[in-house]
């Protein structure tokens, strides 16, 4: 019988069980990979990511839950959209990001995906976040599909980023989205680039997004909203207090001094805005001095992109004003750190 005390014996190494091991992540990844094997070639890149993640879990390199986004960048046959979302993915508990780029899913396809997101409720110990990022650029979604997305957003409490770029939503689709986001408390980043939105759609978005929602980053780049569309956006900026960055590049309003003035007045009055992009708008000559003075008066502005096709002296005037704001911003940060 050994007389050695426990302290004299070699200490046993503590066994550390990772989150991945505790939750049997490898089982879920293997099931997902097997289920995807019955689908078309479009799913191959995603399957490769899943297989690599599974190997990392087996090798002990992945100790946490998997973060594999559903990223597909080619057309999905309509017949397989329901299989993918309602059969294959419904049982996978770790999905947080859906990125479908140029997938040609159309209005009927987006209805199926909206139903999936609405019903996707994984257990909190595995995925307390749910679907947080939803990107469907260039997917042939029209105003009917926009209404399906709008209904989802009006009910959803998990999505923080929504990208609908290069879809023909039109004014009707924009109005549906605008009415929905005012009831959504979690969406922070909304992108509607090149969606064929005109002045009436812009007016609805000014009210729903800029005045009544929690959206902090908003893009209307490439939409023909024109002078009449930018005016309500400018007025909404002066009232809303959430927006941090707005992109209205290439929206065809720069030729109207009155429109530029109204927009700039809103930018100047904003208590939250730090970044503005109005590039690809040919500006009237008087606009440069107006923009520079707005930047000088609103010290929060540290980014302000404009079309470089103007007099060099005018462009430098704007850049100098931004540089001064940038220096001031750094000083304010240093003061906060010293107080802390």
Role assignments for model-derived ranges:
Residues 1-340:
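Leucine-rich tandem repeat or coiled-coil scaffolds
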